[in-house]
Amino acid sequence: MARAVGIDLGTTNSVVAVLEGGEPVVVANAEGSRTTPSVVAFAKNGEVLVGQPAKNQAVTNVDRTLRSVKRHIGTDWNVEIDGKKYTPQEISARTLMKLKRDAEAYLGEDITDAVITVPAYFEDAQRQATKEAGQIAGLNVLRIVNEPTAAALAYGLDKGDTEQTILVFDLGGGTFDVSLLEIGDGVVEVRATSGDNHLGGDDWDERVVAWLVDKFKAQNGIDLTKDKMALQRLREAAEKAKIELSSSQSTSINLPYITVDADKNPLFLDEQLSRSEFQKITSDLLDRTRAPFQAVIKDSGIAVKDIDHVVLVGGSTRMPAVSDLVRELTGGREPNKGVNPDEVVAVGAALQAGVLKGEVKDVLLLDVTPLSLGIETKGGVMTKLIERNTTIPTKRSETFTTADDNQPSVQIQVFQGEREIASHNKLLGSFELTDLPPAPRGVPQIEVTFDIDANGIVHVTAKDKGTGKENTIKIQDGSGLSKEEIERMVKDAEAHAEEDKARREEAEVRNQAESLVHQTEKFVKEQREGENAGKVSEEILTKVEAAVKDVNDALAGTDIAAVKTAVEKLGTESQALGQAIYEASAANEAGNTDGAGNDDDVVDAEVVDEPTDSDKK
């Protein structure tokens, strides 16, 4: 049976976990780290770098390095590199492919299936796009699971049969969620969820960048935002400062040679940022987490005093101001410190993968839809069929009728959101039910059915009860990809994987060739100038040198087959050289033996002749 993994595809970092003997294990990547930066870079030589290698070269390759792409997933955003446009799904797929590759290296077997997590407040288009990213990466996405739900699953599964209420406060690199869940007797049920898809650690970093830019401009009159390379260095320094301020009261931000002045003199940036100043310039960001928290308490109908455990998820919750706020909101309750906020979501995803593959028994995960779903009816009103925080999977139907006499068709427009006017909500998609028989208005019976699967992905059907005619739409946002596009991207990704493999093989061949050339040149020099000089004929040495030249000429070109051929030829000539050296040495030893007579050293001479004696046996 193929192995399944759990993947936390994050805005800034991603994690993969797998079940080993029923226990979840976080897999370290090829670089030895348990978290992989969600960064993809297109190097000038055509190589695609993912993770830490991509992050390391970001300063010198700003325009071709992509980060925080998760913020764009489910939209029509794209980026053009070397004349080719890439969607967020394709870029995210690169990160997923690396995680898949690292997990396969760890397990020693292929991985085909995965559970991928998304922020609880992700809309339908964002969920659909995440699933597409998995497909492009060559994964069968078993389930899309909400991040707080996965975290609660990882945290609460070993807490016994007693029913408990868990608040998950999830502040990642680019998104924020807060969820209230009940866990007991193997059932994990989400009671309510809320959040902000555009709030995360990146925003804290940008505030520090803006603060540094203002300080530098005041001192030097130069706007660093105009310099892409300087801006990238500022972002990296801001992230580092934010992390340091989680454990220190102040941090030094020192960037030498950040730019030059009008006279081409180098300028340096050197600032001290205190924790209090950092909290001051980011206080409004922190305040944005309050409303979703209050909404969850209200929607769930559970009082703050009845919350048993508070779990912090996401690296951004390490900021002291965040944990202080959570303590304040929960009436002084201390957040649980027993989980790793960076890894707990991937661990929960691996457990859910185990549930779906039958490796983990007696666990039921009941998730909810984060936003209400409905259609636009007469007057532009949003008529909700499924209210937010409804447990999924679910199916709801409602019957509508026509607004005009002899209306030949009805347009079904599907919206997601909480506003009373449909146009103020997010349009997920629309379709038409046509060829309705002529009838007075109010007579036709149009049954609209909403069906949300366990991934939170919506299917809508409209059916004319009179004729039985129906039309169905699987909600696919304007940014959604067709089946053909996904297949094309899968092939592109596979081809790129082959390219990467070929590039690695080429590098190995070149390295071996260069090493062989170096060793052979050294060997030839020793035969000409060393203590054994003159023992091998010049003809053999000349042939070896010619073969070395052929390898060097091939290395200067791009034909890897020519390099292999030249290396084989050099190998043959090197063997001939080795044989000549051996024969010369043997002849020399034999000469020494003949000249020794009946000297006492004759015993030693017999040792040299041993191979000849053994051949006779």
Swiss-Prot record:
PROSITE patterns: HSP70_1, HSP70_2, HSP70_3. Residues 597-617 have a biased composition (Acidic residues). CDD domains: ASKHA_NBD_HSP70_DnaK-like. Induction: By stress conditions e.g. heat shock. The modification Phosphothreonine is found at T175. One of its GO terms (molecular function) is unfolded protein binding. Residues 588-617 are annotated as: Disordered. The keyword Chaperone applies. Gene3D superfamilies: 1.20.1270.10, 3.30.30.30, 3.30.420.40, Actin, Chain A, domain 4, Substrate Binding Domain Of DNAk, Chain A, domain 1. Acts as a chaperone. Belongs to the heat shock protein 70 family. This is Chaperone protein DnaK. It comes from Rhodococcus erythropolis (strain PR4 / NBRC 100887). The lineage of its organism: Bacteria, Bacillati, Actinomycetota, Actinomycetes, Mycobacteriales.
